[in-house]
Curated annotation (Swiss-Prot):
Enzyme Commission number, as recorded: 2.4.1.21
Lineage: Bacteria, Pseudomonadati, Pseudomonadota, Betaproteobacteria, Burkholderiales
Organism, scientific name: Paracidovorax citrulli (strain AAC00-1)
Known catalytic reactions: [(1->4)-alpha-D-glucosyl](n) + ADP-alpha-D-glucose = [(1->4)-alpha-D-glucosyl](n+1) + ADP + H(+)
Protein name as catalogued: Glycogen synthase
Keywords: Glycogen biosynthesis, Glycosyltransferase, Transferase
A Pfam family annotated for this UniProt entry: Glyco_transf_5
PANTHER family given in the database record: GLYCOGEN SYNTHASE, GRANULE-BOUND STARCH SYNTHASE 1, CHLOROPLASTIC/AMYLOPLASTIC
Biological role stated in the UniProt entry: Synthesizes alpha-1,4-glucan chains using ADP-glucose.
Length: 508
């Protein structure tokens, strides 16, 4: 199959979150299975691009769309070719892909509408780059209009509509939906018949993500549990009715991790290598991390790590609420991240009171992130919801049993230490509350202090799990095949939908 992977970000070129990591890892994993994959993304300012431009295609101004160019970049090695959408007036800006220091870019609807429209055009016989995709794989709201545009192209082609690509949309985080005033719809070339409740309309506005969910031939999300959760009012963010109506086309596929980059036996960012069979180097990593952060070298204290956004969604308020107890019980804390200023301040205040046993670094440092994963005894990740998550997989790969909530990808990738079959890899909260967090931390402390053999078994279980991308890639290829063989999909009628008060969000 020929697959176009359309995305707004891809590490290391540009990354604001997990989508950037997936865009870097999944396409080459699919290509390794024998499929032809191209990756489409905008040409942002100052991207650290390495490769050779081997093709150039002009896209003249047409209707709402400004003139642009498609540049093909071959990066060599295992990397898939890039198609960069160059339109300096839309993409050559500072800040993140979605916002400047002053806030969201006011023309984001046009910026990402163009990206989705070009993605859809590449799925037609009139592809502007001389290469036509069989599947257009959209990711989150910035490319989610592509399935709708493909529907318009297919309908316009009449009997020749079967030559138009099928589509998939992957939901990486349903909280971000690309919601814009409805007057953008006409400017983006969306036909009126697609603007009712059974189409892209969402509480009187245009929802790019809802359009993708309604018109895609296949819908995926980043873990099986999250696929179930987003069909509930609690985590559906106003789209649970749409997702329940389309449940037959919805599938959860657990993300993988880059097992070359996140591998303690060959990680150049940690002071000593180690493996499931030779764990000695982990003690050296713990000692080095303590030295770096100024923590006491106390052999009786268990070191808990945390790397992530400092928000209530990530359960940071529970970490703050349980920190004093954790320290009293013989723990230490090494925290790296940024987010809510109030939570940052609360963590810093705790660290100031306990400088020998708690350290907080506000910001991000890749080397320190690896050091925390390698040097900690356990990793805290008590998210209230987590579509997939990566750090819990990194932690298991590094022999650092995580403490997690039973949600999303955390539930799918961590087995509790009390597993009757002896396959435990971490500690799963028994509920979602401060008390449940404190109890799980207490279980981890108790096992680490009293049962070293059981703890080593927990470490080895996690380190021996395969979190690579191959299994995920196979599942996506199977889903592509199902989308190609599926009969024409039609949006659900209004009677099939049920909305709650939405939490629309246009940006990450």
């Amino acid at each position: 199959m020929k697959i176009l992977f359309a995305t707004s970000e891809c590490a290391p070129l540009v990354k604001t979150g997990g989508l950037g990591d997936v865009s870097a890892a999944l396409p080459p994993a699919i290509a390794a299975l024998g499929h032809e994959v191209m990756l489409l993304m905008p040409a942002y300012a100052d991207m650290p691009l390495q490769g050779n431009i081997t093709g150039w295609h002009s896209l003249p101004a047409e209707g709402p769309w400004p003139a642009a160019q498609l540049l093909r970049v071959d990066r060599g090695g295992h990397e898939v070719p890039l198609l960069l959408l160059s339109c300096p007036q839309l993409y050559a800006r500072g800040g993140s892909p979605y916002a400047s220091a002053q806030g969201d870019h006011p023309d984001n609807a046009l910026r990402f509408g163009l990206l989705a429209h070009v993605a859809a055009r590449i799925g037609t016989p009139q592809s502007p780059c001389g290469w036509t995709a069989d599947i257009v794989h959209a990711n989150d709201w910035p490319t989610a209009l592509a399935p709708l545009y493909l529907r318009q192209f297919r309908d316009a082609a009449g009997p020749r509509g079967d030559a138009v690509a099928r589509s998939m949309v992957t939901v990486h985080n349903l909280a971000f939906q690309g919601v814009f005033p409805m007057d953008w719809a006409q400017r983006l070339g969306i036909e009126d018949r697609h603007l009712g409740i059974e189409g892209a309309e969402f509480w009187g506005q245009l929802s790019m993500l809802k359009a993708g969910l309604q018109y895609a031939d296949a819908i995926t999300t980043v873990s099986p549990t999250y696929a179930r959760e987003i069909q509930t009012p609690e985590l559906g963010f106003g789209l649970d009715g749409v997702l329940r109506a389309r449940a037959g086309r919805l599938q959860g596929i657990l993300n993988g991790i880059d097992t070359a980059l996140w591998n303690p036996s060959q990680d150049t960012l940690i002071p000593a290598p180690f493996s499931a069979d030779r764990l000695e180097g982990k003690a050296a990593c713990k000692a080095a991390l303590r030295r770096t952060l100024g923590l006491a070298q106390d052999g009786d204290r268990m070191l808990f790590g945390l790397v992530g956004r400092m928000t209530e969604q990530k359960g940071i308020d529970w970490v703050i609420g349980g920190a004093e107890r954790l320290l009293r019980q013989g723990g230490q804390l090494a925290i790296l991240g940024s987010g809510d200023p109030a939570l940052e301040s609360a963590l810093r205040a705790l660290a100031k009171r306990h400088p020998r046993h708690m350290h907080v670094t506000v910001g991000f440092d890749e080397s320190l992130a690896h050091g925390i994963e390698a040097g900690s005894d356990s990793f805290l990740m008590p998210s209230r919801f987590e579509p997939c998550g990566l750090n819990q997989m990194y932690s298991q790969a590094y022999g650092t049993p995580p403490v997690v909530t039973p949600t999303g990808g955390l539930a799918d990738s961590v087995t509790d230490a009390d597993d009757p079959a002896g396959n435990g890899t971490g500690f799963v909260l028994r509920g979602s509350s401060q008390a449940a967090f404190d109890q799980a931390v207490g279980r981890a402390l108790h096992l680490w202090k009293t049962a070293p053999d059981a703890w080593r078994r927990l470490q080895r279980n996690g380190m021996q799990r395969d979190f690579g991308w191959t299994a995920s890639a196979r599942a996506y290829v199977q889903a592509y095949g199902a989308a190609r063989n599926r009969a024409e999909t039609r949006p659900q009628t209004a009677s099939a939908l049920s909305y709650r008060e939405p939490r629309p969000a246009a940006e990450y």
